[in-house]
């Protein structure tokens, strides 16, 4: 099947999700330059009163206004605070409470940006919603929309978009997918957009620059417990299982163990029933798994074919990992990797790729040490 770049029909009205950053700024500029009827929308998803600390929403809105004024396009604002709290943030808390590590940015794209924001854009007369994501929307021979990686491998964001629905993708445009980040900044500078040198946002949007532990403590009471080795030896005390992720090295505070080597300590497992953090040193075997099970599956077009080999990512910016796709009796996805995978984390997403094309994926719910041969 052949795929070609998608071009919105001339005369289309396109809404741009304006974040106040350089990517959405250049997205709006490029679309207007191409002759489309463009307007911006700035959405507010978080209420500053929900938590103490600094929130950049006010500054971001001012930056979005400056850019839209420079480009001479209208800017609308909309409040999705309640929707975000109910459909993204509450699940984020539930997952951490259950000892898993969620990715709220994936949920925000599916539940808010390409659902609530897209609907609001449509009500304002938009034919399409454009965002500053580094991903590509291509079109197949039979005119189906397909999601491909952005050409900038360091910035590709198809991982965060894999849970959107085919209907949502059909109304989405990603003008930056064929550009490098440095090209985007250069365009912004040449056009005189005030966001050309604005720092990229990092981390979870509603946490900002605050320490993660301090933020989470406002919502989930911490229960301290023991750190133990797989053999049951007590080596320290943890501050609450929710604060730790599989493979974590920093912040464990383990030292001076008699008879222990100088190798660093890592989080291996979480024993939820006993409130125990299992830790080990160096490249411990419990850090590595060959098989994972994923549920809550979402496919952009057709599902991967059982028994075939694809590539997968189990976290953002991971290099593609070759794996065989199978399905468990209950319909969940089973991936068997060619190479052992380090620190597969429950609650994160396993995303499947066929070459550069993103097929979709699901939430990692289990992992196994499986040793079976999966050579193709």
UniProtKB/Swiss-Prot annotation:
GO molecular function: ATP binding; tRNA binding; tRNA-uridine 2-sulfurtransferase activity
GO biological process: tRNA wobble position uridine thiolation
Keyword DNA repair: no
TM segment ranges: none
Disulfide bonds: 108-205
Compartment(s) where it occurs, according to its Swiss-Prot or TrEMBL record: Cytoplasm
A Gene Ontology cellular-component term: cytoplasm
Binding site for ATP: 17-24, 43, 132
Family: Belongs to the MnmA/TRMU family.
PANTHER family: MITOCHONDRIAL TRNA-SPECIFIC 2-THIOURIDYLASE 1, TRNA 5-METHYLAMINOMETHYL-2-THIOURIDYLATE -METHYLTRANSFERASE
Function: Catalyzes the 2-thiolation of uridine at the wobble position (U34) of tRNA, leading to the formation of s(2)U34.
Name this polypeptide is given: tRNA-specific 2-thiouridylase MnmA
Organism: Dichelobacter nodosus (strain VCS1703A)
């Amino acid at each position: 099947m052949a795929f070609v770049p998608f071009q919105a029909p001339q005369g289309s009205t396109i809404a741009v999700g304006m974040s106040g950053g350089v990517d959405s700024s250049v997205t709006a500029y490029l679309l207007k330059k191409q002759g489309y009827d463009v307007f911006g929308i700035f959405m507010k998803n978080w209420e500053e009163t929900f938590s103490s600390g600094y929130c950049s929403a006010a500054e971001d809105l001012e930056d979005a206004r400056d850019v839209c004024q420079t480009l001479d396009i209208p800017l609308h604002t909309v409040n999705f605070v309640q929707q975000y709290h109910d459909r993204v943030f509450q699940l984020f808390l539930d997952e951490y409470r259950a000892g898993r590590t969620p990715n709220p940015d994936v949920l925000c794209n599916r539940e808010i940006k390409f659902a609530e924001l897209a609907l609001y854009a449509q009500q304002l007369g938009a034919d399409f919603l454009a965002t500053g994501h580094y991903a590509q929307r291509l079109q197949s021979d039979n005119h189906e929309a397909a999601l491909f990686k952005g050409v900038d491998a360091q910035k590709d964001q198809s991982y965060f978009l894999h849970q959107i629905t085919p209907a949502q993708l059909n109304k989405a445009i990603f003008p930056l997918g064929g550009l490098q980040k440095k090209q985007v900044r250069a365009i912004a500078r040449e056009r005189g957009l005030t966001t050309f040198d604005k720092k990229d946002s990092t981390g979870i949007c509603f946490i900002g620059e605050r320490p993660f532990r301090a933020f989470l403590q406002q919502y989930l009471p911490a229960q301290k417990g023991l750190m133990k080795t797989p053999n049951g030896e007590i080596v320290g005390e943890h501050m609450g299982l929710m604060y730790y992720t599989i493979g974590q090295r920093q912040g464990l505070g383990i030292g001076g163990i008699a008879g222990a080597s100088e190798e660093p300590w890592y989080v291996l497992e979480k024993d939820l029933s006993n409130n125990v953090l299992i830790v080990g040193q160096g490249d411990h075997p419990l850090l590595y798994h060959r098989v994972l099970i994923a549920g809550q599956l979402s496919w952009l077009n057709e599902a991967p074919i059982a028994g075939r080999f694809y590539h997968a990512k189990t976290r953002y910016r991971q290099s593609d990992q070759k794996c065989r796709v199978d399905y468990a009796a209950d319909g969940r996805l089973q991936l068997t990797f060619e190479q052992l995978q380090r620190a597969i984390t429950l609650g994160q997403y396993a995303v499947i790729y066929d070459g550069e094309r993103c097929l979709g994926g699901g939430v990692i719910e289990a992992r196994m040490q499986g040793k079976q041969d999966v050579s193709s």
